[in-house]
Amino acid sequence: MFAPGRPLRLVSSRALGLAIPAAALVAGVTIAQLDGGADFLTALAAVATPLLAAGAGWARGWRLPWLPALCVPPLYAVAWLRPEAWSSDLAGVVLIGGACLAITGLVAGVAPRSWLTAGLVLLVVLDVILVWGERQVEPTMNALQAAAPPTIGRPLPELQQVDFGSATMGWLDFAAPALLGLLVQRRFAAGVATGLAAALWGLLLLATSPIAATPPVLVGLVVGRTRRGRLPILSSPLRSRTHEWIHSRRLDAPKPPGS
């Protein structure tokens, strides 16, 4: 969320901006529930995650694009060689987070920001439907949890989902705030708002599990796209007409006697 980004503009497609976030969620859920699909995604994640994380600097347009590539090998070694340690969970979180930064940086290079914003909102809506409506996410998580990564001497790191202690999150739960960071003007305020909203949203786990983890990014989206002194929910043309109406009302207001 707080990571800066100036992604390269590759192409500009409104359809891609609207479709990619939601399509990624649907594809992941569908593949994981196919025969052998969870094993495929697990093997793909074990290999592709470090490669994507290493390219995060280039995908996001950082000043030191090579820095993530230097950090990836030791992180991957920790996740691979110490699978039972808490440091392995932490390394996995960082690697998956870096991969999500890279993916969202690439996605931001192929679609206008406004349509990516609509795509992010659509992703949140679909996430809620699949978690609480269609109940498709829990079987997917269970299938990925049971899948084993390929073995090269010892099993490769399990990077198909984010595991930290007893908490489990999907890739898109990380990708959503990573994409949000590229869509808002006030990134720090959006990050703080998303974090606070996520902490309150997490209280739902006391009543039900699993829960959709992406809705808090909508709070960050509203806060991050709000300019100081501006009406956050109005578009620019509507905001201008609103200000003109207020100004005209002030001019038409009766003046006090003696003024």
Model regions and ranges:
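A membrane-topology feature that recognizes alpha-helical transmembrane segments
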Residues: M1-P257
